[in-house]
Amino acid sequence: MNFAIIFSGQGLQNLAHVHELRSMAKELQVVDELELYLPKLFYSDLTEADLYPNEFAQPFIFALQWCRWQKLKPEIGDLMSFSGYSLGELSALICATQIGLEQGLYLAQQRASLMSSAAQDASGLIAVQGINLNTLEPLLTETSTSLSIKLSDSSFVVGGADANLQQLVQQLELRGTRFVKRLNVTIASHTVWMDAAVQPYQQVLQQQDFARLCTAMISGSGGHKFFKTTDAVNALIHQMNHAIDWDACLTVIQENQPDMVLEIGPGSALSKMLLERNPNCLVRAVDDFKSWSGLQAWLDKQSRI
């Protein structure tokens, strides 16, 4: 079977993921690296609210994804592509170039720190469903907010300063928009609010010695298929302050016709999006399973069908 692997973004992490990462760290013998870059992970009084601030969330989610991938690799047959949603695009690049956890944690930490510094005012993201882009765009201009992610023709993520986002929410509610929700993300990623982070992060990435991609990457930024590491790195830089077209990425994944699509997590939102588009597609998320043994048994069963 050939697999397309999807790396999720921020917002759906929870304390169960904390316990899982601690356990995997012991199993994979990477506790020292996590204690260095994520000391808070081992605090006994860690709460769910502690998981969402940007400078903890990004390296934490990356570490979870990296460790999950190390465990999954032996179970995966033919690897067709990696894709990453938002932060997940960094994780996809790191796993595709087979970088170690410590270097990956450094890159995730630098990304988070630079993005937090760029966001001078309190800001974040909201999810909007049930409106088309032609109707939404004038409201974005009116409220000084920006498109962050296109999920479909009627589903978007919007970024901006907190006060401006509140104005937008009010405008959307007045128009009877079906769904508006504040996300558990504390920066306006993939918008002009991140402009100041781009050049310094480009310098950070250019100082790294990336290996060749072990598989193709379908960019979460717009569905472009990359076979060269430099192209994937450039896409990662570009998406910091430009809107992501995740809709296009899912289209290209479908067109490639993988036998199975597996979402690394955290969460299962991306696999559900793909399943809604194509109910006949074999799509699951790691978080769909209560245990690793359950996931392994399911993968083994699929390989024998």
Region annotations inferred by a language model:
Residues 64-77, 82, 240-305:
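Flexible, low-complexity segments
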Residues 10-11, 97-234, 238:
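Alpha/beta catalytic cores of group-transfer enzymes, especially the acyltransferase/condensing modules
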Residues 17-20, 95-96, 170, 273-276:
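Short amphipathic alpha-helical segments
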